[in-house]
Design a protein with these regions (language model features):
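Active-site neighborhood of phospho(di)ester-bond hydrolases with catalytic His/Asp-centered motifs
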Residues: 22-23, 47-51, 77-81, 146, ...
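Short acidic-glycine loop/turn motifs at beta-strand connectors
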Residues: 140-141, 267-273
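Acidic, His/Gly-enriched loop-helix segments that form or flank divalent-metal centers
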Residues: 106, 110-245, 251-256
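Active-site neighborhood of divalent metal-dependent phosphoester bond hydrolases
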Residues: 56-141, 166, 170
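N-terminal active-site segment of His-dependent metallophosphoesterases
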Residues: 1-66, 70
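Short, solvent-exposed aromatic-acidic interface loops
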Residues: 279-288
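A general structural motif
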Residues: 16, 42-45, 72-74, 141, ...
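Active-site environment of divalent metal-dependent phosphoester hydrolases
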Residues: 26-30, 55-58, 83-87, 152-153, ...
Length: 290
């Protein structure tokens, strides 16, 4: 029974009875209470957090402090694109300070360090040290946990197959996994044809508020957009294939307009089936029948 990190993937050959997954907390303190309720109900479950803990609401510091503690107790904490933007700013690479600041980076710096800290000051912080030690993906025999997605084909875990350029941006394995949207969802992006999942594993992601998901399946079924205050857990799945499970509950939305988008804490069994979901509407959790 081993865990090892290769290509920013934490690979685990064990199958746990249950997994607790939460992504896209975005500084939302209320989400921490949902996690604690899930941990109380499933005390032996493996906690996996899927990225985007910063940039958004007012409790970024409390969220990262909580995750640092949880990791020390065995939680698996993954990176999202917002953490990567923070690291890019700290490492003074690319142009991510502009993109990150557009996505609430200044507010995150003020919450973490009391000011809009310089890259050097950020590199000296415990938060930088913590985030640099986080992998991008966690893979079990039956499940892939990742922030944005992986290519839903047989070579999903082969870094060499990801290299490309899109609208001037270099796409590689790490970039895809934290930023992927349409390329992960669709086989035909123009016509929004929902792709098959050929990885033979359930893929559990955050990154995109589930209310914006839409598309058409090969068999004619439709996935329609939902209202922005209804970011429930959703699946893209064909018969006989494992699901792609989307969990982002919309915590990066305006808290004055959508105050109860507190995220979705999802409990899965070892096969990757959803067992229970905790959110604002169901803080004690709702059981799910597959």
């Amino acid at each position: 029974m081993t865990q090892k990190i290769i290509n920013n993937t934490l690979a685990d050959d064990r199958v746990k009875e249950n997994y607790i997954f939460i992504s896209d907390i975005h500084g939302n303190h209320e989400t921490l209470g949902l996690i604690e309720q899930a941990k109380k109900d499933f005390p032996y479950a493996q906690l996996v957090t899927g990225g985007d803990y910063i940039d958004g609401r007012d409790s970024v510091k409390e969220v990262l402090d909580y995750l640092i503690e949880q990791k020390s107790e065995g939680a698996i904490v993954l990176l999202g694109n917002h953490e990567q933007m923070l690291l890019n700013y700290a490492n003074e690479c690319e142009h991510q300070d502009g993109i990150w600041f557009f996505n609430s980076g200044r507010d995150t710096l003020r919450q973490l360090l009391g000011e809009v800290a310089t890259p050097e000051e950020l590199r000296a912080s415990r938060y930088y040290r913590f985030l640099t030690g986080c992998p991008i993906m966690y893979e079990t025999p039956n499940i892939v946990f990742v922030h944005g997605g992986v290519r839903p084909d047989e070579k999903y875990n082969d870094p060499a197959t990801y290299n490309s350029v899109d609208h001037g941006f270099k796409i590689d394995y790490d970039f895809y996994r934290i930023w992927a949207r349409e390329r992960f969802w669709y086989s035909d992006t123009l016509n929004k044809k929902i792709a098959h999942n050929k990885t033979k594993k359930t893929i559990v992601v955050g990154h995109t508020p589930t209310c914006v998901l839409e598309g058409v399946f090969d068999d004619g079924r439709l996935m329609n957009r939902l209202s922005p205050d209804h970011c429930i857990v959703r699946k893209m799945q064909y018969p006989g294939e494992p699901a792609r499970i989307f969990t982002d509950g919309g915590s990066h939305s305006d808290p004055l307009i959508y105050p109860h988008n507190d995220g979705n804490v999802v409990v899965l069994d070892g096969k990757g089936d959803v067992v229970k979901v905790y959110n604002y509407n169901d803080p004690q959790g709702t059981e799910v029948e597959e």
